Amino acid sequence: MNPYVEIIRPGNVIMAIIAVILVAILAKSVDIPIILAMLAVFFAMSAGNVINDYFDYKIDLINKPQRPIPSGRISLDNAKNYAYLLFILAAIVGFLISCLVDTWIPCTIVIFSDIILYLYAYKLKSTPLIGNLTVGFMTGLCFIFAGYTFNEGLIIYESYLLAFFALIMTTAREITKDIEDMEGDMAEGAKTFPILYGPKISAIIAISLIIIDCALCPLLYIYHIFNINYLIVVSIAVLIFLYGAVLLRNQDSKTANKVSKYLKTGMLIAFIAFAIGTFTITF
């Protein structure tokens, strides 16, 4: 894979774009502003991933030596300039969206996101729990951003509900990833939550968040946000989440890596459930 494509972490970026697509499905509408919203999310999230690798290159020499910067396929200067370009492109697209929908909220969200993504990579990531919550918050913000792109009350309300779900599960996954990366983080002197308070307490928090999200999933059906088809499909995601929670009783790096992948898979299935639950489909 081309290193400039690899460094943006296409899988993570696609997950963020899916958030925008899901809100479009909820609204049953696809127009120019929502297409631009996908583009803005692509640029902003890509920039965040690149600048994160820029600041993390020493840690990645231990944890992820195959990544573009530690492997020498992209220089530090090129990575930094690449990130800045992507941040600027995101802001430009955000400005265009605001002009089209006649509200400055989308542009404000994009600029705010650019700043938070940079601060996360520079400082917040190493702040215990705050860094994890920041990633969860940014994931949820993708839904809210899409909601304001439509600028309709009901869609905005529903986007906040989806954002809350994404915030909790993403935070759980980020804590799990910190458990996985403890060796490299300790070598670099990072003060992540698992390093300061231990992997066991960290796992308890992650498991608790997973259980909370699983308990909340039926509410989106009970309160008629989604139909019965959502409940059927999201049940699969819930089983995957709970299986990951059970595995996390063992906090070694290999298990944490496996759980992180399970949570990511479960979130993708949950997103599919959100989409299916919007339409009347007979299985």
Curated annotation (Swiss-Prot):
Checking CDD domains in the record gives: PT_UbiA_DGGGPS
Q: Which UniProt keywords apply?
A: Cell membrane, Lipid biosynthesis, Lipid metabolism, Magnesium, Membrane, Phospholipid biosynthesis, Phospholipid metabolism, Transferase, Transmembrane, Transmembrane helix
- Look up the EC number in the record and give it: 2.5.1.42
Q: Name one Pfam family in it.
A: UbiA
**Pathway of this protein?**
Membrane lipid metabolism; glycerophospholipid metabolism
Q: Where are the transmembrane segments?
A: 5-27, 37-57, 85-105, 128-148, 152-172, 203-223, 228-248, 263-283
- Give GO MF terms, alphabetically: geranylgeranylglycerol-phosphate geranylgeranyltransferase activity; magnesium ion binding
Q: Which cofactor does it need?
A: Mg(2+)
Q: Which reaction does it catalyse?
A: sn-3-O-(geranylgeranyl)glycerol 1-phosphate + (2E,6E,10E)-geranylgeranyl diphosphate = 2,3-bis-O-(geranylgeranyl)-sn-glycerol 1-phosphate + diphosphate
Kind of enzyme, top EC level? transferase
Query: GO terms for CC?
Result: plasma membrane
InterPro entries on file: DGGGP_synth (IPR023547), Prenyltransferase_related (IPR050475), UbiA_prenyltransferase (IPR000537), UbiA_sf (IPR044878)
Give GO BP annotations, semicolon-separated.
glycerophospholipid biosynthetic process
The superkingdom listed in its UniProt entry is Archaea
Q: Main site of residence?
A: membrane
Cystine pairs annotated here are none
**Compartments, as annotated in UniProt:** Cell membrane
The way this protein sits in the membrane is described as: Multi-pass membrane protein
| Family per similarity comment | Belongs to the UbiA prenyltransferase family. DGGGP synthase subfamily.
Q: Briefly state the protein's biological role.
A: Prenyltransferase that catalyzes the transfer of the geranylgeranyl moiety of geranylgeranyl diphosphate (GGPP) to the C2 hydroxyl of (S)-3-O-geranylgeranylglyceryl phosphate (GGGP). This reaction is the second ether-bond-formation step in the biosynthesis of archaeal membrane lipids.
**Under which name does UniProt file this protein?**
Digeranylgeranylglyceryl phosphate synthase
